[in-house]
């Protein structure tokens, strides 16, 4: 999809976000190919995701929640994987905070202590996803401002914005990538008083030109205020 988009818009700078990283030879090769297509990307950005795919894929696809792996072992393994990634690629690696897969299971992945531990061990900067922060805070019955203040905000270089929605069955927040709400704009304004990202990315996955235009105009006004 990126290759086709580059052919249509050859002059537009593209920033590639890997998301969940596959730490093996096919994963590294795919990342190299993406970087070649997006040479303007200043960073390699990946999820700060110590949970193995064996856990996350069943949870996301089928709502199947397997037994939790060792938090200590999972975090140690992820730190080692990030360090190997840093050796393979010249671009700095930045890490995106994760939401909560479940309000009671696997919470170590999005604990502020885990994010601090990985950041300090790897030296990576932070990609702060505000939708993920809202979901992680709600899973802990914690005020989202208190949750965000517990993160390494001085290391934030990029932010992701996306509209959350509530699951009709569970009532829990999820990252819907819908239009931003009033609460999202207010949270962004509050966060920008405490962090200084170089990039802000709107993750909007719908095809409503009016909604996209409205969000971009409101974001521009807020950021430039």
Each language-model region and where it sits:
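Acidic (Asp/Glu)-rich catalytic clusters
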Residues: 2-16, 26-42, 83-89, 117-121, ...
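Gly/Pro-rich active-site loop or hairpin
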Residues: 62-75, 136-197
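Acidic/histidine-rich catalytic cores of soluble enzymes
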Residues: 86-171
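Active-site beta-loop-alpha junctions enriched in small/polar residues
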Residues: 17-23, 47-51, 98-100, 131-135, ...
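Active-site acidic/histidine proton-transfer and metal-coordination neighborhood
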Residues: 25-125
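C-terminal helical cap(s) of enzyme catalytic domains, especially alpha/beta-barrels
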Residues: 209-225
């Amino acid at each position: 999809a990126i290759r086709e988009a580059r052919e249509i818009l050859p002059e537009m700078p593209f920033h590639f976000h890997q998301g969940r990283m596959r730490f093996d030879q096919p994963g590294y090769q795919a990342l190299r190919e993406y970087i070649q297509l997006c040479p303007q990307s200043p960073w390699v950005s990946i999820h700060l995701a110590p949970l193995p795919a064996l856990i996350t894929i069943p949870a996301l696809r089928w709502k199947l929640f397997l037994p939790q792996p060792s938090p200590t072992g999972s975090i140690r393994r992820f730190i080692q994987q990030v360090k190997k990634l840093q050796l393979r690629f010249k671009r700095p690696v930045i890490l995106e905070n994760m939401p909560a897969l479940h309000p009671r299971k696997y919470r170590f992945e999005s604990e502020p202590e885990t994010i601090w531990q990985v950041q300090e061990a790897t030296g990576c900067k932070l990609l702060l996803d505000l939708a993920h922060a809202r979901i992680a805070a709600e899973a802990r019955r914690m005020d989202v401002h208190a949750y965000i203040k517990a993160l390494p905000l001085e290391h934030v270089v990029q932010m992701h914005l996306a509209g959350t929605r509530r699951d009709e069955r569970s009532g829990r927040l999820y990252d819907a990538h819908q239009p931003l709400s009033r609460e999202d704009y207010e949270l962004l304004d509050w966060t920008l008083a405490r962090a200084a990202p170089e990039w802000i990315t709107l993750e909007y996955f719908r095809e409503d030109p009016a909604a996209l235009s409205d969000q971009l105009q409101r974001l521009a006004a807020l950021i430039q205020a």
